[in-house]
UniProtKB/Swiss-Prot annotation, chain A:
Keywords: Cytoplasm, Cytoplasmic vesicle, ER-Golgi transport, Golgi apparatus, Membrane, Protein transport, Repeat, Transport, WD repeat
Cellular component per GO, a single term: nucleus
TM ranges: none
Domain of life: Eukaryota
Protein name stated in the entry: Coatomer subunit alpha-1
Single annotated GO MF: structural molecule activity
Taxon lineage: Eukaryota, Viridiplantae, Streptophyta, Embryophyta, Tracheophyta
Curated annotation (Swiss-Prot), chain B:
Lineage: Eukaryota, Viridiplantae, Streptophyta, Embryophyta, Tracheophyta
UniProt organism field: Arabidopsis thaliana (Mouse-ear cress)
Name the UniProt record assigns to this protein: Coatomer subunit epsilon-2
GO molecular function, one term: structural molecule activity
Compartment(s): Cytoplasm; Golgi apparatus membrane; Cytoplasmic vesicle, COPI-coated vesicle membrane
GO cellular component: COPI-coated vesicle membrane; Golgi membrane
Length: 1216, 293
């Protein structure tokens, strides 16, 4: 049982779940009805109008209403939105036990100790039917969820099923007059609209509860005889099916589970029991120490139950709903029902992999808790709570589409948790001893390792590492080094989510998310008020997580925010761009598209990717107070400026970011004294005296203005101000200005005008303005003040300004980094926005700023790294190594070594087996048996000249082994490379050597040979064709068909070699035109590709035509025309033909008769006409005049002409 | 060596780096505090063996003086043997002398070094005389290699099984099983590949790991991937003999010219087995021509 929420209160007698919201009503023995939000754990409201206990309470399924019934005989209908009781239904004559709304009609059914059941219409607020028949208290009554039935239970030991079909008809067709008449009659006599259909007898004591099955014709009841009975009904009768015994006291309440095939009951014996509804066996029992249970409620939609007891109530789940899943690259493995399933993200394909439980096995709380997957071995570890924690290991068959329903015999074991730590190793936690067993895929223990802390769960933490969890901390433990790599105090961690690069980890607790580095260095902590459910890392290093009702994000610095709200909890499996993949509680995969703009924006800010920030500002609709507040709070008021329309906020942001020009614009718009003043202050701070002046002018703050003029040395303006003051009759201001200006006469004048004659007199006389002083003295008459004695007056004059006006050197405000970033982004991004005022000097500064920052970061990072290293080093010297006992053992065995041990003889190298088995020359060469290879070639192809083959032999030999550096400082191990490897080749069975030449390479060479021929590079072409000819003896192919192709290739290449040799020869013979013509003519009889033939014909035609052998030339021309050449060639050929027609003669006699078929001798280049004797090369099939026999073939340069040979052997298929 | 002891294994990283061919890293990170005397000797052995693997024989010879422990003396012997092949007779004779000495003859490191030296001499009989009993992971691993060299995979497998019983996840066990898998070939090559793949995921890439993977690829006929891996290895160390040798082989198979790599190998490592094979093959060819003619 998973308790989700608990309350402490008076005895709870009635409970009702809200069908949509996370609310529950609890009616108490004290008369209070409480409305709780069980998700947030808060009391939303309380309704206190009943007198005495309230036993029944029920939410309406669509209206904001609920109904309650109590021991004050009253049924009250409440509106929870208005927090008040709408009306009271009166009629029952004793305690009311239960009340329930009809799911469709405006009805309420109530059961009462007055032995009746009443049905009320809450719209007309009248009782529409009274169901009589029970002869003791009716303890419970409820509508059937679909049909027109009511079930009731009574202390008269019966359960009754009532048919209310007639009542429904009356309501549905009230317009029917005749019906109404009869109904009115029946109303008068009562009981006709609702008749008892079945009376279920079987309980020996009073029945406390009866309930319908939500879909099947079943009823379950619980009674004071401590039994739960299951009843079945059909159209005509109802009968007892079975009895569930187990409760030790009166059964208070019993009902079917809404989704699973189970029955839940509770009792005064202080227990809740869960029963298998099919097998009718007890599955689970939950006990409370002191509290008797009184009531039970099932949530209509979700997997939730609630039970009321003596001192409160609990909301609980019977089992977890989180599907176990494991992520691997693009695929997700998860457990659903009794199958392991597979989901591919890219295709969103979902398929069943293997069954993991036999059908019909009890499922409650045995479903997989965690899943761990090893991609290379295709193995899955499934952990469940079965037997106090156990695991099963399945190897998924290769053809895993396994539709079959046969459950594999999994390898099992017990252990707190089991998780793969390497491709073929998994760790199993042994809680009792706090050690892990490392096992292989055969489920054999490979290693045992004690854990550094008492651990109650282990998680993957990179290959060979484990993350161990205890109550209050987690550690990462390296199993091989037996070292603790990192440690972190945390609340109880439930889930661990690694980023894809394994650099960061998110530790999810019930209400906390902790982000840490791979060494468990804390990066940030987030607290949530609602349960944290799941999470995954996105590609940018943002952690996306879900709570019960939100999808949220967490940036690396710990800033978090809501992405969207959720109706039902989901479990995120993967985040990819804007898509969140998740599993819901039904185990269905879903892809949710989210708007990632906000967190990507914040992330860019955080990472100082101002170009991104800028483009996002330009392209997306980011705004809102929250964003502005965020920017301000994070110290980016200048960015916020871009979002704001409101002038006041703009002004504030501008001031904050020191952007005076924006501030001036805003201040002008606002035009309020306070704003001007603040602008003045900021401008003054920056030293922008022009703006200060402007601001002071706007606010007419003359005093400040005059002081400003004084310190800026702007005497003109100062005297102007003095005049203004005079006009405005501001004597004080005037005097100040005069003082600032050092204008003594003016001061005397002001004092005089203001009537301060004595002061004026003193001022004048001190400054030596004697005439004025005298005048004033006369005016003063007797009252001439005496000048102070003994003091030397000094002239009070402000210093003359050296220069005046203009701004002071401006303070560089924090405008710094960001503006620079923005502007440069502007420049980089959009070329046409050239109007950005570039201030290069400033920009330079900014860059420096940026650099500094980065430097500092670097230094910090370096410092951190240094610290880490130090830490590590500190970690080394903890304790001395305990030497393993093995160190001593070898001595004993070593002593015995020389006597017993006999060195085994050396085995056979692979190359030897090659040379033993093969009759292919190439394989012999690769094996290094050059002599055998040569003998084979000699026998098969008559080859005698091996010199051209030398490099092939060496290459084959050199390419036959790779080199493995095994043990340090030891000789390397050469490894024979074999041909035709496949996954299924069995070990220790030797295949023939892999050869460096293959047929496809020759094809390539042939093509380049053709190309060289076309372009007239005859030497190059000849080299290529010859190399083909030289390689073929050492090529091995697999099939017969390829053998034929190889043989064809020999002939093709031979023709070209011969032809090209003749052509090259022809070019040497510049001085022998006859021979030239002959060779050109023979060339045209080599079997060439049509384009090459055309060229050969063209050249032969040209040579002959020039030599005036017109008849022969025209023959070539005709042959050329037959090949349908390009126009230019055709034109030339036609001209030759025409020229020849006029004069069909040959100037010189050639040894060339084109009418008579012939082959050309490979060395003498003379035609061998059909019927003449010849000899041929056993390898390349070139033909020779008989006297060449015994020589090395001049075409292939390999074989002896006329030698005996068995023929080319180039495939194992020929040998078989 | 490392059975199921408790307590952290201080030399783990050092050993690992050494086995996986990260010799410079091993040397650089050899300052480990609070080592027991035995561990300190083992540490020094590993460091000096790393120097030997890097070819710094003289450094080892001059650093280890007369007073050093037996294992270190043995290591010095190896350095002497490898540095001056012309004097190897005297080195071997002093080695034999030490082996005969009952007080030090059974020293694991001495036996290991003896095994390595006799293996260079291709005297497997003598080699196995000293190593066959095993005793340390190093010795077992050496035995595996000896038997592979002798083409006796079944014996190698027995040695490997002993290693697996001691510690299946030990780096040397994994390496040795990769060697054996490669030697027996067939479907086992894939397992060897996975082992090297595991290493490359767990530890920094070294030429040894890259070459291991490349050799697996070549054995599986996947020469293109092998070439990529080898070029990566070449980037790490342009003079690594195995990288060059395997590149020669690989280039031949992908139809590219191998002569540059071969000449480089001939220049930097004239004693390499491939160089020897090439020159012997040339002689062999001429001889065969004579024979057949």
């Amino acid at each position: 049982m998973l308790t989700k929420f608990e309350t402490k209160s008076n005895r709870v007698k009635g409970l009702s779940f809200h069908p949509k919201r996370p609310w529950i009503l609890a009616s108490l023995h004290s008369g209070v009805i409480q409305l709780w939000d069980y998700r947030m754990g808060t009391l939303i409201d309380r309704f206190d109008e009943h007198e005495g206990p309230v036993r029944g309470v029920h939410f309406h399924n669509s209206q904001p209403l609920f109904v309650s019934g109590g021991d004050d005989y009253k049924i009250k209908v409440w509106n929870y939105k208005n927090h008040r009781c709408l009306f009271t239904l009166l009629g029952h004559l004793d305690y009311i036990r239960t009340v329930q709304f009809h799911h469709e009609y405006p009805w309420i059914v109530s059961a009462s100790d007055d032995q009746t059941i009443r049905i009320w219409n809450w719209q007309s607020r009248t009782c529409v039917s009274v169901l009589t028949g029970h002869n003791h208290y009716v303890m419970c009554a409820s509508f059937h969820p679909k049909e027109d039935l009511v079930v009731s239970a009574s202390l008269d030991q019966t359960v009754r099923v009532w048919d209310i079909g007639a009542l429904r008809k009356k309501t549905v067709s009230p317009a029917d007059d005749i019906m109404r008449l009869t109904q009115m009659n029946s109303d008068l006599f009562g009981g006709v609209d609702a008749i008892v259909k079945y009376v279920l007898e079987g309980h020996d004591r009073g029945v406390n509860w009866a309930a319908f099955h939500p879909t099947l014709p079943l009823i379950v009841s619980g009674a004071d005889d401590r039994q739960v009975k299951l009843w079945r009904m059909n159209e005509t009768k109802a009968w007892e099916v079975d009895t569930l015994r187990g409760h030790m006291n009166n059964v208070s309440s019993v009902m079917f589970h809404a989704k699973q095939d189970i029955i839940v009951s509770n009792s005064e014996d202080k227990s809740i029991r869960v029963w298998d509804a099919t097998k009718r066996t007890g599955l689970q029992t939950f006990r409370r120490e002191h509290d008797r249970f009184w009531i039970l409620a099932v949530h209509p939609e979700m997997n939730l139950l609630a039970a009321g007891h003596d001192s409160g109530m609990i909301v609980f789940k019977l089992e977890r709903e989180r599907p176990a899943f494991a992520l691997s690259g693009d695929s997700l493995f998860y457990a659903k029902d009794r199958f392991l399933r597979y989901y591919e993200y890219s295709t969103q394909r979902d398929s069943q992999v293997i069954p993991i439980r036999r059908p019909g096995t009890p499922s409650l709380n045995q479903s997989p808790r965690t899943l761990s997957y090893s991609p290379t071995e295709n193995a899955v570890l499934i952990c469940s709570d079965l037997d106090g924690g156990s695991y099963e290991l399945y190897i998924i068959p290769k053809d895993s589409v396994g539709r079959s329903d046969v459950v594999q015999d999994a390898k099992r074991g017990t252990g707190g948790s089991a998780v793969f730590i390497a491709r073929n190793r998994f760790a199993v936690l042994e809680k009792s001893t706090s050690q892990v067993l490392v096992k292989n895929l055969k489920n054999e223990v490979v290693k045992k390792s004690p854990l550094p802390i008492p651990t109650d769960a282990i998680f993957y933490a990179g290959t060979g590492n484990l993350l161990c969890r205890s109550e209050d901390k987690v550690v990462i433990f390296d199993l091989q080094q037996r070292l603790v790599l990192g440690e972190l105090q945390t609340p109880f961690v439930r889930y661990v989510v690694w980023s894809s690069d394994m650099e960061s980890v998110a530790l999810l607790s019930k209400h906390t998310i902790i982000i840490a580095s791979k060494k468990l260095v804390l990066q940030c902590t987030l607290h949530e008020t609602i349960r944290v459910k799941s999470g995954a890392w996105d590609d940018n290093g943002v952690f996306i997580y879900t709570t019960l009702n939100h999808i949220k994000y967490c940036l690396p610095n710990g800033d978090s925010g809501i992405i969207r709200t959720l109706d039902v909890p989901i479990y995120i499996t993967k985040v990819s761009g804007n898509t969140i993949f998740c599993l819901d509680r039904d185990g269905k995969n879903k892809a949710i598209t989210i708007n990632a703009t906000e967190y990507i924006f914040k992330l860019s800010l955080l990472r100082k990717r101002y170009d991104h920030v800028m483009s996002m500002i330009k392209n997306s609709q980011l705004c809102g107070q929250a964003m502005i507040a965020y920017l301000q709070q994070k110290g980016f008021p200048e960015v916020a400026l871009h979002f704001v329309e409101d002038e006041r906020i703009r002004f504030n942001l501008a001031l904050e970011s020191g952007n005076i020009s924006v501030a001036v614009a805003s201040a002008t718009q606002i035009n309020e004294k306070d704003h001007w003043y603040r602008l003045g202050v900021e401008a003054l701070r920056q030293g922008n005296s022009g703006i200060v002046e402007f601001a002071y002018q706007q606010t007419k703050n003359f005093e400040r203005l005059s002081f400003l003029y004084l310190i800026t040395g702007n005497l003109d303006k100062l005297s102007k101000l003095m005049k203004i003051a005079e006009v405005k009759n501001n004597v004080m201001g005037q005097f100040h200005n005069a003082l600032y200006l050092g204008d003594v006469k003016e001061r005397v004048k002001i004092l005089e005008n203001a009537g301060h004659l004595p002061l004026a007199y003193i001022t004048a006389s001190v400054h030596g303005l004697n005439d004025i002083a005298e005048r004033l003295a006369t005016e003063l008459g007797d009252n001439v003040p005496s000048l102070p004695e003994g003091k030397t007056p000094s002239l009070l004059m402000p210093p003359t300004p050296i220069m005046c006006g203009g701004d002071w050197p401006l303070l560089r405000v924090m405008k710094g980094i960001f503006e620079g970033g923005l502007e440069s982004a502007d420049r980089g991004g959009t070329v046409d926005e050239e109007d950005v005022e570039g201030d290069w000097g400033e920009e330079l500064d900014i860059n420096v700023d940026g650099m500094e920052n980065r430097d500092i970061e670097d230094i910090l990072a370096a410092a951190e790294a240094g610290e880490e290293e130090n830490d590590e080093e500190g970690g080394w010297g903890l304790e001395d190594l305990v030497l393993p006992p093995e160190l001593d053992t070898p001595k004993a065995s070593a002593n015995a070594r020389s006597s017993v041990f006999v060195t085994p003889p050396q085995g056979m190298p692979v190359s030897q087996s090659w040379s033993q088995k093969s009759s292919l020359a190439a394989e012999q060469a690769a094996a290094g048996s050059f002599d055998t290879a040569m003998r084979l070639l000699h026998r098969q192809l008559g080859i005698k000249n091996f010199t051209p083959l030398k490099s092939m032999f060496l290459d084959l030999f050199n390419g036959s082994h790779s080199y493995l550096r095994a043990f340090s400082s030891c000789p390397v191990v050469p490894l024979a490379i074999e041909r035709g490897w496949s996954e299924s080749s069995s070990p220790n069975v030797r295949s023939p050597p892999a050869l460096v030449y293959d047929f496809s390479q020759l094809d390539e060479k042939l093509k380049s040979g053709y190309k060289a021929t076309t372009t007239g590079k005859f030497t190059e072409a000849l080299r290529l064709f010859l190399s083909i000819l030289h390689t073929i003896p050492l090529v091995v192919v697999e099939t017969r068909r390829e053998v034929d192709e190889v043989k064809e290739l020999i002939v093709i290449v031979k023709e070209y070699v011969l032809g090209l040799q003749m052509e090259l020869k022809r070019r040497e013979m510049k001085d022998d035109p006859v021979r030239q013509q002959e060779l050109a003519a023979y060339f045209t009889h080599c079997n060439l590709q049509t384009p090459h033939l055309r060229l050969a014909l063209l050249s032969a035609m040209g040579v002959c035509y020039k030599a005036k052998n017109l008849a022969t030339a025209s023959n070539f021309a005709r042959r050329l025309l037959e090949t349908s050449p390009v126009d230019s060639q055709a034109k030339m050929a036609r001209q030759v033909v025409q020229a020849a027609e006029r004069n069909m003669t040959d100037e010189t006699k050639l040894n060339y008769d084109f009418r008579n078929p012939f082959v050309v001798c490979g060395s003498t280049y003379v035609p061998i006409y059909r019927g003449q004797k010849d000899v041929s090369c056993p390898y390349c099939t070139a033909r020779f005049v008989p006297n060449q026999e015994g020589n090395i073939c001049t075409v292939c340069d390999l074989a002896v002409i006329g030698a005996d040979a068995s023929g080319l052997l180039c495939s194992p298929s020929q040998v078989r | 060596m490392s059975a199921m002891g408790a307590g952290p294994d201080h030399l783990f990283n050092l050993r690992n780096n050494f086995y996986l061919g990260a010799y410079q890293t091993a040397i650089n990170n050899s300052e480990i505090a609070n080592l027991s005397p035995e561990n300190a000797v083992e540490r020094d052995c590993l460091v000096f063996r790393s120097y030997i693997a890097l070819g710094s024989y003289q450094l080892v010879i001059s650093e280890i003086d007369e007073s050093a422990a037996t294992p270190l003396q043995a290591v010095k012997l190896l350095a002497m043997y490898l540095s001056t092949p012309q004097n190897k007779e005297s080195t071997i004779s002093s080695l034999k002398e030490w082996l005969a000495d009952s007080t030090i003859g059974n020293n694991d490191t001495l036996r290991l070094i003896a095994g390595i030296i006799f293996m260079h001499e291709e005297d497997y009989n003598e080699t196995l005389k000293h190593t066959h009993a095993g005793g340390t992971m190093d010795l077992y691993a050496l035995n595996v290699q000896i038997f592979i060299k002798m083409h006796r995979a079944e014996y190698a497998e027995k040695q490997l099984r002993v290693m697996q019983q001691i510690d299946e996840d030990h780096t040397l066990t994994q390496l040795a099983s990769a060697w054996l898998n490669l030697a027996v070939g067939g479907s086992k090559i894939q397992e060897a590949y996975l082992i090297f793949e595991d290493f490359s995921e767990k530890y920094p890439m070294t030429c040894l790991i890259l070459n291991g993977k490349a050799v697996c690829c070549m054995q599986m006929g996947n020469f293109d991937e092998a070439e990529t891996l080898l070029l990566e290895a070449l980037n790490k160390d342009a003079k690594d003999p195995e990288t060059l040798a395997n590149l020669v082989v690989c280039s031949l198979h992908v139809g590219k010219s191998s002569s540059r790599h071969l000449s480089q190998l001939k220049l930097s490592h004239p004693e390499h087995i491939l160089v020897k094979r090439v020159s012997s093959a040339e002689d062999n060819f001429e001889r065969a021509v004579q024979l057949v003619a």
